[in-house]
Every structure is written in C-alpha cells, then in structure tokens.
Amino acid sequence: MLYAILGTSRMEEAMVKAIVGANCGDEGKGKITDMLAEESDIVVRFQGGSNAGHTIINDYGKFALHLLPSGVFYNHITSVIGNGVALNIPYLVKELKSLTDRNVPMPKILVSDRAQIMMPYHIDFDTYEEARLAGKSFGSTKSGIAPFYSDKYAKIGFQVSELFGDENTLKEKIANVCTLKNVMLEHLYHQPLLNEEDIFNTLMEYKEMVKPYVCDTSAYLHQALKEGKKILLEGQLGSLKDPDHGIYPMVTSSSTLAPYGAIGAGIPAASITDVVTVVKAYSSAVGAGAFVSEIFGDEADELRRRGGDGGEFGATTGRPRRVGWFDCVATRYGVECQGATQVVMTALDCLSYLEEIPVCVGYEIDGKVIKDFPVTHILKDCKPVLKTLKGWHCDIRGIQNFEDLPQEAKDYVAF
C-alpha cells in the first residue's frame, strides 16, 4: 500500500504520538502504526474493543489485530491495553495464541487494572438489539460494544481490579446486574435469563486468564514519560464514528478522537505532542449511515476489488465495504476534529487503474453548495459536488519518494 505524509511537524522528537483515522475507519492505520511502532518503546490501545481490525503485513505474514496493540510484533516494545478499552479476555488470549501459533515471539503485554471487562451477555444483548431493530439497526459488528459502554457509564460494568478484590462484594454486584438485565431479557428480548453463579464462575475464569498481565498501567506510563520513553497511542476507527462528532447515531460507543487517547491510556493530555491522522485516497465504510460520495454497481465493485490489502472487506465482519470517491468535506472535518499535526494518505496506488478520478469537493442541499460537514439529518439529504482530476494510469507500487510519483499522482495528493 502506497502512502504519503503531508505537512510538517515534530515527528522525530515527539515523546507521545497518537495515530488516528479521519473518516469511518479502514483508512490504513495499521500500516502506518506498524511503521511508527518500530520506532516506539510502548504502544497503547486506548479505546474500543475487538469490533474493528487493523491489518498488518510483515515478515510473519498477514494479520488482522482486533484487540492487541500493533507493537506485538517487536521484541523491544511493551504493548499496553489501557483503561479505555472494552476488554474481551477470552479474545485477548485467543489473539495471543494466534500469534505464537504462527511463530511470532510472545509479546510483552500489560493490561490496565482499570480496564472494564466485556462479558458474554454484552455480545448477546448486542445481537438481541440488532434483531429487535431489524431494518432500522445500526449495522453493529455484534461485538458487544454498545452494551459494554452502556454498562460502563451506568456504573454496572466489571473492572479488572474487581476480580482481585473481595468475592462477596463482587457477588453482590453480580446479583444487582442480574436483576437489571433479567428484566430486559424477560420482557423486551424474551431470551434466557442470566444466572448469578454462572457469571461469577466466568469472572473467576477470566481472573486466571488475565492475571499475568494486569498492573497499574497508568503508573507505568507516567514513569515511562519521566524516563523519556517513546509512546504511541493507537486509535481505532475514525472521526466520523465518534459518538459526539461523528454521523450519530451510526457511530461507535467510545471516543475515536486523539484527545481521548490521554483519558483511555491514563496519561496527561498535554503529553500528546503529535497527532498523526490517516486518510485514504478514496472513501469506504462498513455498515449503515449517510455516505455522500458513495458509488454503486460495477464502478463500486471494481474499486472494492482493487482496494486495500486484498480488497475492501471488513477485517472483523468480512462484509464488503461500501466505497466512494475521496470526500474533501468529510475528510477536512475529520482531520480538524483530530487536531492533526500530520496527515498521512494511504492506498494511492489503488486508484492507478483510473484515467479520470472524481473527487467530492462540496455537498449540494436544497439547491445550495456547502463546504462544512453538517449534522446527520442534513447529511443524509446531501448530494456530492464532484470535480474530476486526471489519473496517472500507471503502476506506482514500489515508489518510495513523493518526488518520484507521476505529476498527476502528486497533483491528486496536493489537491
């Protein structure tokens, strides 16, 4: 995948960098994260869960990481799962095993004692709710993310630290959770009820699984900052999936913005000195929601087939991604939301087959053209205003320097 770094910044000197997406995710962050991880001492996942994947291609093969930080392929890196992550403990263990089964050395992993635990019933509730909503569903990956974060903010989630506390206190909390959940299961979803003993036993199993990795990761990271370590904060999805600033309600349930990296990792906000924001040379999305520059039919199938690392299909769901032309309005907004100090464009080579390349430069709504990204109820009625750029129509894979690109490709990046 070809990429270009745009703009200037303090990339080499930065102590803490955040790498995030400007759009709906799938921007190619994994490739850039892998590149930056090699220069880092610590890589931190700070939000989300196993609901989205980062594709990494290296000497060990091709991997789609869903929960583990991208630093797991480097022996010198400590990989941290921060307090902001939706921690699916069996999935963590499974993903670690999938690495070692393919001859990747066992990575150094730390898990925050303040992280909250994804429970099996979160995944069940996600599935039940999508079924209940039917044609009006949000296109969930059914990874339990929305029910998990609902419980976290309703203060009925289970923190990792609680596994190592008083068991009677834990059992009292389980009883309260079951009382609340079983009302919904019985009267709304008409599904089997939760059993207190089963939940306690599950949590005790999780305790043994995660015990080797648990620590106060915030204290660890604060000490690392004092020692001048290089820390990389690895974001999931992108600006347009943020619950506050994205295409609500077709969003995820945790903040996808770089400033949240400090909260989800447990470090001072001022310590983030670089925000590397990734965009793709065209647009893509998984699931429902407004998508102004979307294309359809044979045109979409061709771009989908040529896109990404082996086609535009979700790393978690395998669903074909919706695709469209580069959207200047949405991308500018996404970059601004992230507070980008650098912008990286990926997948430029995927457009090499086109003689002409449309770009969305504005939105038309009620006979007017707007350049600012609107709220959802306006966005869904917008039509793309397209400008056609000349394609380079040659293979640019393998080109290492921006100056060596065909002029048309350079013009596209600079547009």
Model-identified regions with their sequence ranges:
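Non-transmembrane, aqueous-exposed alpha-helical and coiled segments at domain scale
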Residues: L2-F415
